[in-house]
């Protein structure tokens, strides 16, 4: 089953601590800001959208597009990852769809695709004014988390926060 394969892959990724092999988004953005690059933020755009976004940006052969995967701050909430500077555009459509209580598949998924399309169009428009545009996100998200029936109890004395997205461990 796909869910079992995904869970196994995630477990292996966590066990090997692969997260720490990625550069921090903060460091990458600091370098880009020094060189005057236009930064375009997308709230809640996870890595699962890279294929579609890359295709939309490069399908006409006019844009040189490279992908660099980085890590955000833990916990992966907007509050912990608000690194946008004044004047940097922020697209919130994906986050709005994900947090909408009437999320229905496939309608909400199709709306998310439309948001990614609008992100690509906006990035292409920005490229008419800037030589380089970096598209980045504060965090990703997954419907898998909220639709899974499997629940994991936090360790003793841990306090679950952000509707169970993460837990703060005790001081001992």
PLM region descriptions:
Residues 1-172:
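Feature captures the catalytic ectodomains and active-site-proximal regions of enzymes
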């Amino acid at each position: 089953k796909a869910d079992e394969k995904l869970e196994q892959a995630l477990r292996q990724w966590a066990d090997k601590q692969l997260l720490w092999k990625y550069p921090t988004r903060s460091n990458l953005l600091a370098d880009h800001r020094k060189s005057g690059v236009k930064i375009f933020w997308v709230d809640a755009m996870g890595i699962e959208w890279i294929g579609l976004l890359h295709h939309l940006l490069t399908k006409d052969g006019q844009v040189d597009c490279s992908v660099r995967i980085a890590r955000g701050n833990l916990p992966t909430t907007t509050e912990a990852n608000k690194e946008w500077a004044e004047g940097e555009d922020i697209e919130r459509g994906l986050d709005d769809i994900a947090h909408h209580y009437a999320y229905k598949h496939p309608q909400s998924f199709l709306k998310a695709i439309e948001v990614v399309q609008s992100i690509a169009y906006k990035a292409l428009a920005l490229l008419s004014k800037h030589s380089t545009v970096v598209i980045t996100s504060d965090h990703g998200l997954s419907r898998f988390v909220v639709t899974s029936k499997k629940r994991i109890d936090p360790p003793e004395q841990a306090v679950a926060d952000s509707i169970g997205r993460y837990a703060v461990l005790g001081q001992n």
